[in-house]
UniProtKB/Swiss-Prot annotation:
Enzyme class, UniProt record, top EC level: hydrolase
Function: Glycosidase.
Binding, substrate: Y216, R232, Y244, A245, T246, H247, Y322
InterPro entries on file: Gfo/Idh/MocA-like_OxRdtase_N, Gfo/Idh/MocA_oxidrdct_glycsds, Glyco_hydro_109_C, NAD(P)-bd_dom_sf
Keywords carried by this UniProt record: Glycosidase, Hydrolase, NAD, Signal
Residues annotated as signal peptide: 1-19
Binding site for NAD(+): M67, R68, D89, W138, K139, T140, H141, E158, V159, N187, Y244
Similarity comment: Belongs to the Gfo/Idh/MocA family. Glycosyl hydrolase 109 subfamily.
EC number(s) recorded for this UniProt protein: 3.2.1.-
Coiled coil: none
UniProt name for this protein: Glycosyl hydrolase family 109 protein
Length: 468
């Protein structure tokens, strides 16, 4: 009897194990959810490494003079080879106030456009503008960028430049068709730790980079009232997924040479329930919101074509220290920016002139502060060697905004490929829709389009263009 029970139990366990294995194979065999990749129109070509005729003076029109636009005017007034031709905002008083920045800098006032939500179109239609610089709310970014390029202008668009795949493809197709630059104004790729770490990666200090992390973790509770017509909180209320991924994505993708030798292939995302968003609205207005879409925290995991991974987080709702989570994991080393900047390296990866006593280095803890400073000085990026002092004086998120604008103008004046192209824009913005699709399908994997449409491996590694 005991033997029969034992035999029955063994058979049952075997059948259960077989069923579990079969289920696992079935799940692992599921193809990722596919999204459409529109065919490239006949005669249209990619804009990888796009160069355009040199501009001795870059004539600029700026749309949006709220939280960020006036700072851009201030920075451009200090960058050689620029001219602010036109300013635009719905509110006339913002245009008038921003004109004071030009006057204070000893520059002529710009043409003014205001009083209408369509006034920006007149700015784009001017024939004396080379670059339209767009710093408005998210929902208007892509439309303005497309319109600017269609009217013969390069487009520089604040993050995120596009919120849907449809908007992304419109920007790509317009840039390819018009042969105009379309750059997303992602400033975090120019921050000092990030750019130094990128240079270290290029020099092989970390070995092969296998994994990178990024995030936007910033409690915006005190800032919600300052967004015009409550647009930002309203967007989070209506949209699920990582709606603001670019600050984390940009530096991480540059580390992994995305569309410069590798490409993002699949994404899996999940989120928490929404708690603090609806609570904030109830506290401020008394309204009970039962369908607030954006979870307090959203996490996305991405696999690349060459077997590397990215982890991206979004949280603007809970009280946490500010963090962009910048992290690089290599075969021979590690970099981490938050909460404390640190490097962890094999002793062999550190030159003896930096750390003469190798016994004090190991791969289980960070290098000393002294060694870290020496590494950051040794591998300081050439862009920082040129611009760091001025950038910190001018300011703009500690100087990285100035470097971003300077590099944009530098490349346009020298006829060089920009530091970021329209495919970077696409890759860093696509999480807004793709993470939502994954979440709404039980965190299923979603295929990430090849926004270069077959050209992701043509450029060998990410580098900044420099004039000879």
């Amino acid at each position: 009897m005991v033997y029969k029970v034992f035999l029955s139990l063994c058979i049952g366990l075997a059948l259960s194990a077989s069923a579990a294995l079969h289920a696992q194979k079935a799940v692992s065999g599921h193809a990722p959810i596919q999204v459409e990749t529109p065919a490239r129109s006949s005669g249209q070509k990619h804009v990888l490494q796009l160069v355009t005729p040199k501009l001795e003076t870059v004539r600029i029109g700026i749309i949006g003079l709220g939280m960020r636009g006036p700072g851009a005017v201030e920075r451009f007034s200090k960058i050689p080879g620029t001219q602010i031709v036109a300013l635009c905002d719905v509110l006339p008083e913002r245009v008038k106030k921003t004109q004071e920045i030009l006057v204070k800098a000893g520059l002529p006032e710009a043409a003014a456009y205001s009083g209408s939500e369509d006034a920006w179109k007149k700015l784009c239609e001017r024939e004396d503008i080379d670059l339209v610089y767009i710093v408005t709310d998210w929902k208007t970014h892509a439309e303005m960028g497309v319109y600017a390029m269609e009217h013969g202008k390069h487009a520089a668009i604040e993050v995120p430049a596009a919120m849907t795949l449809e908007e992304i493809w419109k920007l790509i197709d317009t840039s390819e068709r018009t042969r105009k630059h379309c750059i997303q104004l992602e400033n975090c790729v120019y921050d000092f730790f990030e750019l130094t770490t990128l240079n270290m990666a290029h020099q092989g200090v970390f070995g092969e980079i296998l994994h990178a992390e990024g995030a936007y973790i910033h409690n915006l509770e005190d800032f919600w009232p300052y967004y015009w017509n409550n647009w930002r909180l309203d967007y989070n209320r209506k949209h699920r997924g990582d709606v603001y991924a670019t600050h984390g994505m940009g530096p991480a993708c540059q580390l992994l040479d995305i569309h410069r030798g590798d490409r993002m292939k699949t994404i899996v995302a999940m989120d928490t329930k929404a708690v603090n968003g609806p609570a904030y609205i109830k506290n401020k207005t008394g309204e009970v919101v039962a369908d607030f879409q954006n979870g307090d925290q959203t996490t996305s995991l991405i696999r690349t074509e060459k077997g590397k991974t990215l982890l991206i987080q979004h949280n603007v709702m809970t009280p946490r220290p500010y963090s962009r989570k910048y992290q690089a994991v290599g075969t021979d080393g590690f970099a981490d920016k938050y909460p404390l900047e640190m490097y962890c390296l094999r002793p062999a990866q550190v030159d003896s002139d930096i750390a003469p006593d190798h016994e004090k280095l190991n791969a289980h803890g960070p290098v000393s502060e002294e060694v870290k400073k020496a590494l950051m000085e040794k591998y300081k990026h050439p862009i920082h060697r040129e611009l760091e002092e001025t950038a910190k004086k001018v300011g703009g998120h500690g100087g990285m905004d100035y470097i971003m604008d300077y590099r944009l103008i530098y490349c346009l004046r020298n006829g060089l490929p920009l530091d970021m192209d329209v495919y970077d824009l696409a890759e860093w913005c696509c999480l807004a829709e793709l993470s939502r699709i994954s979440i709404e399908n039980g965190s299923a994997p979603v295929a990430i389009p090849d926004f270069t449409r077959g050209n992701w491996d043509k450029v060998k590694g990410y580098r900044h263009a420099m004039a000879e």
